[in-house]
UniProtKB/Swiss-Prot annotation:
Keywords: Cell cycle, Cell division, DNA-binding. This is Probable cell division protein WhiA. It comes from Geobacillus kaustophilus (strain HTA426). It comes from the Bacteria. Involved in cell division and chromosome segregation.
Length: 320
């Protein structure tokens, strides 16, 4: 089961207060419901491929409203296709839609989120939970990028969802138009974690955070290893260059031509090619020399080698 499916399954087991029941159910019916007419009677059909969500809708309807509710399963004939679960409301469908602020008194569709539904903070949380159950998805935190989104057919409702998430919960949600509708989405791991907490998916939140911590630690270790590897490669490269330059000087004018201080460092570097500058400084006969002091002398040796390669004269009085 995917992380998104596990999260939704957890949400379908939450207990809700009567006021919150209405808010959650409004989002579920608004986003997954459709109207049908048979024999002059209107019915509401709510379709989902998730059995747990279908049971949730059925339970909320039976618990909160005096309406006739039926549950159907439509089996898809194609291979690897999930069943479709249909929750149908027949008697009382019109009054239910008005009660849930999905339609106005004249039966025109309300695309916005009615303030009556989300007066309390708990109801705001419940509406977002219903919206996520109806049209939400969230990436597995082990994947390359963090992403949570809620899909809506209508732009106005999508904007209202984004506004609810940002103005009351400061989630920094953004909206985007898709081919068949609109999405409100989150990309920041911290905000996704906050959203899971807001809608009551606490087990999913704990799993998300556990995976995120391990992932962030792994990334930090990788960055540290990469940095240390780069520094090591740089150090090895510098040592090889120094040895090459010292050997070139030895072959052209001889190391004995170098001033005593440079000659001593040159011989030490040839003898100890794999040691650090600090370790090299501790080998000097006259006493310990700092890392910067050793680096200065080696740079002077590099300059002498470059001048010799270029056929330029070398003034050893300026080489210290």
């Amino acid at each position: 089961m995917s992380f998104a499916s596990e999260t939704k399954k957890e949400l379908t087991h939450l207990e809700v207060k009567p006021c919150c029941l209405r808010a959650e159910l409004s989002a579920l019916l608004r986003m997954n419901g459709s109207l049908s007419f048979s024999g002059g009677r209107m019915a509401i059909d709510v379709q989902t491929e998730n059995a747990a969500i279908a049971r949730r809708i059925y339970t909320l309807l039976k618990k909160g409203y005096d309406v006739a509710v039926e549950l159907f399963v439509r089996k898809k004939m194609r291979l690897k296709k999930n069943n479709v679960y249909i929750v149908r409301v027949t008697d009382g469908a019109a009054s239910l839609l008005r009660e849930l602020h999905i339609v106005n008194g004249d039966f025109s569709l309300i695309h916005d989120i009615s303030p009556e539904l989300v007066k309390k903070k708990c109801c705001k949380r419940s509406y977002l939970r219903g919206a996520f159950l109806a049209g939400g998805s969230v990436n597995n935190p082990e994947t390359s990028s963090y992403h949570l989104e809620i899909f809506s057919l209508y732009e106005e409702h999508n904007r209202a969802l984004c506004e609810l998430m940002n103005s009351h919960f400061f989630l920094n949600a953004k909206t985007l138009e898709r081919k068949k509708g609109f999405i409100t989405y989150l990309k920041e791991a911290e905000k996704i974690a906050e959203f899971l907490n807001i809608i009551g998916a606490h087990q999913a939140l704990l799993r998300f955070e556990d995976i995120r911590i391990v992932r962030d630690m792994r990334n930090s270790v990788n960055r540290l290893v990469n940095c240390e590897t780069a520094n090591l490669n740089k150090t090895i490269g510098a040592a090889l260059r120094q040895v090459e330059n010292i050997r070139y000087i030895d072959e052209t004018i001889g190391l004995d031509s170098l001033p005593a201080k440079l000659r001593e460092i040159a011989k030490l570097r040839i003898e100890h090619q794999d040691v650090t500058l600090k370790e090299l400084g501790e080998m000097v006969a006259g006493g310990k020399i700092s890392k910067s002091g050793i680096n200065h002398r080696l740079r002077k040796i590099d300059e002498i080698a470059e001048r010799l390669r270029a056929g330029k004269p070398v003034d050893f009085h300026k080489s210290l």
